[in-house]
Regions:
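Sequence/structural signature of beta-propeller domains
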Residues: 22-391
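Low-complexity, compositionally biased segments in intrinsically disordered regions
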Residues: 385-424
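Bacterial N-terminal signal peptides that target proteins for export
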Residues: 1-9
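Alpha-helical transmembrane segments
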Residues: 12-16
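C-terminal motif of bacterial Sec signal peptides marking the signal peptidase cleavage site
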Residues: 18-20
């Protein structure tokens, strides 16, 4: 039986209209990924006894931490500049579940090696290549570790990024960017405020390294009333060590006024951590004399802001900083003590599939401070798929709905998850 034209139009027009309403998943996916935030649920706290002996060394000064998921193992980097014992890192097991965190079990100590295979000396040895270890990251693709040293302005030692084997044997050193070389006087990086944070992209192809604070050329030190200059965060190719991109991040002003008012106070970036291929967690730590430490975690998207890799001096108007969103202010935890936290890493997943987030503090080998581990559950909104409404194809299985070709055939709703961008 021939269908009238009006019936054909009645069935085709709605289908075409529905198809015209289809969503482009590549466009909406990127925006949705950037808009997604996270929240943290506090799990618990654990501490390590002051000056505990591990493998014949004094444990302390932990400035970096990373998690080896395959081995269920943590790497803890000490910032001891070979003053107490040769520069080193520790391996440890840390039991974490949804209800708490247990005291870490130290397993071994590994000394950092120079290119000739010897250990690093300290000031007492009158060494000229004293390291200042700060950040450590495990790269599963090569079963190796990256670590940073802040350098020393007085000794003329530049901040560096190095790769080593799990036994501490040095593999290589990344090429040095001229802008991060130590300079005399008030130019170049500020002393002890250089390569403090580091994180690898999930695919291991690139590594981000953050300055703790602004270079002299880029801005001032922070105050209680005014933020300091921008800290540069640089993306390097993991294999070549060459820089790819650089963004500018604006740390907060110092949140608490010191007591007395002219007392010591600062604020900077001790650590960064990739949440996924583009989103990054940034830890800000401040200290105010007479008040103590303050910690805040921010979420940024590394695609935001301008690329400042080739901008020699950052001034308002010649760059766009990345935007940041507050995830947590540790003041809200009401802990008995909040110490000098410098390390941040993901830990094991909980039974519900959520990741854990672990922080560790640097006690500076002082009796008045503690090595504090804080564990959190990471709660992320579940990704929402883009739905594309399409007209049915010619092979539409009408029998499933009853053979009624004179009725408008039902449209197909096809879920298409947001594509995950990858770094080439």
């Amino acid at each position: 039986m021939r269908r009238p034209i009006k019936f054909l139009l009645a069935s085709l027009v709605p289908a075409l209209l529905l198809a015209g309403c289809a969503t482009n998943p590549s466009d909406s996916g990127a925006d949705a990924a950037k808009a997604r935030g996270i929240s943290l649920r506090f799990i618990g706290e654990a501490t390590v006894p002051h000056r505990a002996l591990v493998g014949g060394t004094t444990f302390g000064g932990i400035s970096g931490i990373d998690y080896d998921e395959a081995r269920d193992l943590y790497y803890l980097l000490s910032d001891d500049r070979s003053d107490h014992n040769p520069a080193r890192f520790y391996t440890a097991k840390i039991a974490i579940d949804a209800k708490g965190i247990k005291t870490p079990e130290m397993l071994s100590v590994v000394t950092l090696k120079k290119p000739d295979g010897t250990t690093y000396g300290g000031k007492a040895d009158k060494a000229t290549d004293i390291p200042d270890p700060e950040a450590i990251r495990y790269r599963a693709e090569t079963d190796t570790l990256f670590w940073t040293s802040e350098g020393d302005k007085k000794l003329g030692l530049d901040p560096v990024i190095r790769e080593m084997k799990l036994d501490g044997t040095m593999i290589r050193e990344f090429p040095k960017l001229p802008m991060f070389r130590m300079q005399p006087g008030d130019s170049g990086p500020r002393d002890n405020l250089t390569f403090e944070g580091m994180t690898l992209t999930p695919d291991g192809k690139a590594v981000w390294v953050s300055m703790e604070a602004a270079r002299f050329e880029d801005g001032i030190d922070p105050t209680v009333d005014k933020p300091g200059g921008p800290a540069r965060i640089t993306l390097y190719h993991s294999n070549s060590g060459n820089p790819i991109r650089q963004i500018a991040y604006l740390p907060d002003a110092i949140p608490h006024r010191p007591m007395p008012p002219n007392g010591e106070a600062d604020n900077g970036i001790p650590e960064i951590l990739m949440l996924d291929q583009f989103r990054m967690l940034v830890l800000e730590r401040s200290y105010s004399q007479g008040v103590g430490n303050s910690l805040r975690v921010y979420l940024i998207d590394t695609r935001d802001g301008s690329d400042v890799l080739n901008v020699p001096v950052l001034r308002e108007g010649n760059y766009t900083p990345v935007q940041k969103r507050l995830v947590i202010n540790f003041d809200s935890l009401n802990l008995m003590k909040l110490d000098n936290t410098e390390g941040m890493t993901f830990g094991p997943r909980l039974p519900n599939g959520n990741r854990t987030l672990v922080f560790v503090s640097d006690d500076n080998f002082r009796k008045s401070q503690i090595t504090q581990f804080l564990a959190f559950e990471v709660i992320e909104p579940k990704p929402v798929a883009s739905y594309i409404v399409e007209p049915p194809p010619y092979w539409w299985p009408y029998p499933y709905y009853g053979y009624r070709p004179w009725l408008f055939p039902r449209p197909i709703i096809v879920p298409r998850p947001h594509p995950r961008p990858k770094l080439d």
